[in-house]
Amino acid sequence: MDLNIADIAFDSGEVRYRYSRYLAEDGRKWIRHGLFTAYHKNGQLASEGHYVHGVEHGVWHDFHANGQLAAEGNYEDGKEIGEWRYWNPDGAQQST
């Protein structure tokens, strides 16, 4: 499988999404595989996690536009599993 990096931009040209992907065997669609990152319009990291053959897998982190951690949890085969934790933009942890 040959991976390449996709950069999807906001209208401003700044990176909105960056992820690795490969072309499906039938050549008709791209499948995310590996690190996925999303960014807020201000350039701060919005989300980071991994895909395995097109589905979320492993630890994911979401961030507020100010850079504070917003959420943390695990995916297994594209489904949220276990306890997820959440934080307010000021960094205070919310109840789960």
Regions found by a protein language model. Give the residues of each.
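Glycine/tyrosine- and acidic-biased, solvent-exposed loop/turn segments at the edges of beta-strands
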Residues: 1-96
